[in-house]
Amino acid sequence: MRPWPAGSADRNLPLVMMPHGGPASRDHAGFDWWAQAMASRGYLVFQPQFRGSEGFGQELLEAGYGEYGRKMQTDLSDAVEYLAGAGLVDRERVCIVGASYGGYAALAGVTVQQDIYRCAVAVAPVSDLVADLARDRREGGRDRYNTSLRYWMRFLGVDDHNDPILATLSPARLADRADAPILLIHGRADTVVPYEQSEFMEEALSRAGKEVKMVTLDGEDHYLSFPATRLRMLEETIAFLEEHNPPR
């Protein structure tokens, strides 16, 4: 958790659930400019090391295999319930924010899951797993040496890129289930998660009559490498949170 918001009573705080990217990655105890920006506005920011995270032993990493969109997702909502039960956060004032895999988790939190979050912010997210695996297969080849495809299929728990379960875990294909406002932010020059993944989500949400805002960062890559676009992302994120989940 990020430091307690200044001036808070340390109880019943508004929460930002912030899963990291990867998913085979981790958060560190050092300075995090994005998390700290939200904490400075009065939010308790929780960065969970959910199953599938690396750096805590092989058992935790492998516990994520086959759990993408499943137990990797409920690890987050279980943390919400724990923090609320301990009186640290207000169960009715919770949003989810993330980038890359964390962006997928943010979208899944209000589509695959429901009745948990008041809003979702997804930066450079995968929204359609079917389309994303098809791209990986097309660009990386179909054989066993396509390490990217094997990585994703291991976490997704599928043996075929056309497995029907992928549609049931794809937020863009579940847009009619969205139960909270969604902010999408994506760099147009992203070569890791293509910009079209946010376009898929925005178009599906709009067709379903759901509340969505999309912010395009022209010339920006997956990692938000430019200070000006990082600043814009922070401003858009905080404004969206304060609109839909006011800290005070």
What are these regions (language model features)?
Residues 10-21:
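Short beta-strand element of the alpha/beta-hydrolase
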Residues 13, 43, 117-118:
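Short beta-strand segments enriched for Tyr within beta-sheet-rich domains
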Residues 26-28, 196:
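Short N-terminal helix/helix-N-cap motif within the alpha/beta-hydrolase-1
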Residues 48-248:
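Active-site-proximal cap/loop segments of hydrolase catalytic domains
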Residues 29-48:
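Short amphipathic alpha-helix adjacent to the substrate-entry channel of hydrolases
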